[in-house]
Regions:
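Flexible interdomain linker/hinge and immediately adjacent N-terminus
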Residues: 101-139, 197, 242-252
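N-terminal core-binding DNA-recognition domain of tyrosine recombinases/integrases
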Residues: 13-28, 34-126, 143-146, 224
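Active-site/catalytic core of tyrosine-dependent DNA strand-transfer enzymes
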Residues: 209-278
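Basic, Lys/Arg- and aromatic-enriched nucleic-acid-binding interface segment
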Residues: 134, 138-168
Length: 370
């Protein structure tokens, strides 16, 4: 049974290079494209792309809609269908302009990978993002053991995520020198820290509790004072795996190196929430928690702008659109409160006049009568 087609492999390599070097896409995006194209090739039994016709796209859409997810065991979601087909649409649109394919494919052929308007709306609909409450996060952190250095690292890791709102990929690549306990800040330098869109910015510790900051400070002090680690050593080092007494590989302290991916961080979160008897919330959900906290504590546009910048957002609109929707329960509270008639506060003419006079005097205007 054919596992690949030589011409297909060559043109795919060109496309992946185009995505990475011309379009500037990340490795994650390129991998998503490769996965989608492979799904299609498996379905067509690796038929030459030059023999593509629109009936293949139509049949593949039906086939994909009938497939079950490997993890869930249920039908693939509309969002998964949309993401896969969008990648294929982009690939075949590009392919139609390449030498050797121009005479066989038309740009409009790629349009047959579109979902119906109804399914597209379902796939792209915005849904309320789940996030833990402040009390839940603190309960999880306080429930975590701290007897071994691995346990101390794990507890400090979740506390640090809560304190800074940093993304897991950034945390996995941070060094000790990036944390300033005097200024209560973290320098997310894109030259060394894997930030989103390679942005460089400074994050000041969010006001989530002195006990949370203290856990992070104790961890930094442990690495610097007890283990004598320096500025370029990892803030949250990887777990050392060694052969144990039972001749089985097991965790044995910490390696003096970074985690290669953020996957172990998500595992720490999953285990911590499970041990606390709470549903799993991933590291990114803490950013939603912090946005909701900001909506409560910020009293002016300037304050919320600073809060937004602290999350690495250049525009406040990003915070509102991506994270800042009003939680459903809070939405109900606001609407019910608005249904209650409220007495509008009105100033008397004398009060208004006094306010004007005060403002003029503060501005240095001479209003004395002559």
């Amino acid at each position: 049974m054919t596992k690949h087609h030589a011409d297909n492999e060559r043109i795919k390599r060109q496309y992946f290079a185009f995505l990475k070097d011309a379009k500037g896409n990340s490795e994650t995006t390129v991998d998503a494209a490769a996965k989608a194209i492979n799904r299609f090739e498996v379905y067509t039994k690796h038929r030459d792309f030059k023999l593509f016709h629109v009936e293949q796209a139509i049949a593949f859409k039906k086939h994909l809609a009938e497939q079950n997810g490997q993890r869930s065991g249920q039908k693939l979601s509309k969002a998964t269908l949309y993401a896969t087909l969008t990648q294929l649409k982009g690939f075949f649109h590009w392919l139609a302009g390449q030498p050797g394919y121009k005479s066989r494919l038309q740009y409009s052929d790629a349009e047959f990978f579109n979902l119906s308007d109804k399914d597209t709306r379902i796939a792209t609909a915005r849904r309320e993002q789940q996030a833990p409450t402040l009390a839940q996060v603190k309960y999880v952190i306080q429930s975590m053991p701290s007897g071994t250095e691995i346990e101390r690292r794990d507890r400090a890791l979740i506390a640090f995520t809560f304190l800074t709102g940093a993304r897991d990929s950034a945390i996995a690549s941070m060094k000790l020198k990036h944390v300033d306990l005097i200024a209560n800040s973290v320098d997310q330098d894109a030259r060394e820290v894997k930030t989103k869109f390679s942005k460089t910015f400074r994050t000041f510790f969010f006001p989530v509790g002195d006990e949370i900051r203290e856990m992070v400070a104790e961890w930094v002090a442990y690495l610097r004072d007890d283990k004598f680690w320096g500025n370029d050593d990892p803030l949250f080092p990887a777990t050392r795996i060694a052969l144990g007494a039972t001749r089985q590989f097991e965790a044995s302290g910490l390696e003096r190196e970074h985690w290669s991916t953020a996957s172990p961080i998500r595992t720490v979160f999953r285990d911590a929430f499970a041990s606390a008897g709470l549903p799993y919330f991933n590291p990114h959900s803490f950013r939603n928690t912090l946005v909701r906290l900001g909506q409560d504590v910020c009293k002016s546009p300037e304050e919320f702008k600073a809060w937004s910048q602290n999350l690495g957002h250049e525009q406040v609109l990003t915070t509102f659109l991506s994270y800042g929707e009003v939680a459903c329960q809070r939405q109900g509270e606001i609407i019910r409160a608005l249904a209650t008639p409220q007495q509008a506060a009105q100033s008397s003419p004398d009060e208004f006049a006094d306010a004007v006079v005060k403002r003029l005097r503060n501005s240095g205007v001479d209003i004395s009568t002559k």
